[in-house]
C-alpha cells in the first residue's frame, strides 16, 4: 500500500516503549552485555480453576515482524539514520542517543534474533515460559527487549482468547455429556461472535484465530 509518510522506513523502530530507545546506553551503564534473553511467561490467571495458558500467536507475530522491518532494510542507510535522529530529537531533544547502532542494524540486513518455544496450541502452566528469545549477534544486545514491546502487544490477545475458548469448550463438552445432548452442537454453541466488540479488525483477527 502506498504511503506518504516519510517516516515509514523507521516506523518499526518507533514501535517500542520510549525508554527503550535508550536501552543501548542503559545496558552499558552495567558493562557491555553480549546476549540478552527475554521470555514470555504468563504470571497468573484470572479465571478460577484455570492454571494453564494456551501458547498461541508467535508464528503470526514473527511474520508481521519481518513485514514491519522490510521497509527499514529496503531504504537507504543514510536516510533511515537521518529519520531516526530527527524523530529522536522530537521526542528526547537533539544529540541524545545517536544512530550508530541503527546504521549497524541496517548493514546487518536482518534482525539477529532467535525465538524458541513450545508448539503453538500447547497449554503451558502459569509461571512457566511459553517461549524465549535472544540476540544472536553480541553487537545487537539492545535489540532483544527493544522489540519486547511488540511481542507483548501481539501475543497476549490471541493466547488469552485461546485460553478462554479452551475453558469454554471444556464446560460445553461436559455439559453435553451430562445432559445427553448431541456433542456436535458444541461447535455451534462455542462459535466466536466477538468481532463487533473488538478494538480493530486486526484485534478481531488475532482473537478469532486464538478462539479457533
Where do the model's predicted regions map?
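Buried, small/hydrophobic-residue-enriched core segments of structured protein domains
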Residues: 4-47, 105-112, 121-124, 130-212
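Low-complexity, highly charged intrinsically disordered N-terminal segments
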Residues: 36-97
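Outer-membrane beta-barrel transmembrane strands
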Residues: 116-118
Amino acid at each position: 500500500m502506498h504511503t506518504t509518510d516519510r517516516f515509514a522506513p523507521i516506523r518499526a523502530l518507533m514501535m517500542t516503549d520510549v525508554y527503550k530507545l535508550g536501552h543501548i546506553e542503559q545496558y552499558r551503564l552495567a558493562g557491555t552485555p553480549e546476549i540478552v534473553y527475554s521470555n514470555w511467561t504468563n504470571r497468573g490467571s484470572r479465571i478460577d480453576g484455570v492454571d494453564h495458558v494456551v501458547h498461541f500467536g508467535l508464528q503470526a507475530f514473527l511474520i508481521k515482524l519481518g513485514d514491519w522491518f522490510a521497509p527499514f532494510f529496503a531504504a537507504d542507510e543514510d536516510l533511515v539514520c537521518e529519520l531516526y535522529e530527527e524523530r529522536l530529537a522530537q521526542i528526547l531533544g537533539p544529540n541524545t542517543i545517536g544512530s550508530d547502532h541503527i546504521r549497524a542494524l541496517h548493514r546487518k540486513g536482518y534482525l539477529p534474533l532467535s525465538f524458541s518455544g513450545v508448539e503453538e496450541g500447547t497449554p503451558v502452566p502459569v509461571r512457566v515460559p511459553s517461549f524465549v528469545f535472544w540476540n544472536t549477534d553480541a553487537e545487537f544486545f539492545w535489540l532483544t527487549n527493544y522489540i519486547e514491546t511488540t511481542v507483548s502487544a501481539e501475543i497476549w490477545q490471541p493466547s488469552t482468547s485461546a485460553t478462554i475458548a479452551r475453558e469454554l469448550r471444556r464446560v460445553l463438552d461436559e455439559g453435553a455429556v451430562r445432559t445427553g445432548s448431541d456433542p456436535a452442537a458444541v461447535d455451534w454453541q462455542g462459535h466466536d461472535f466477538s468481532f463487533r466488540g473488538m478494538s480493530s479488525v486486526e484485534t478481531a483477527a488475532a482473537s478469532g484465530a486464538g478462539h479457533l
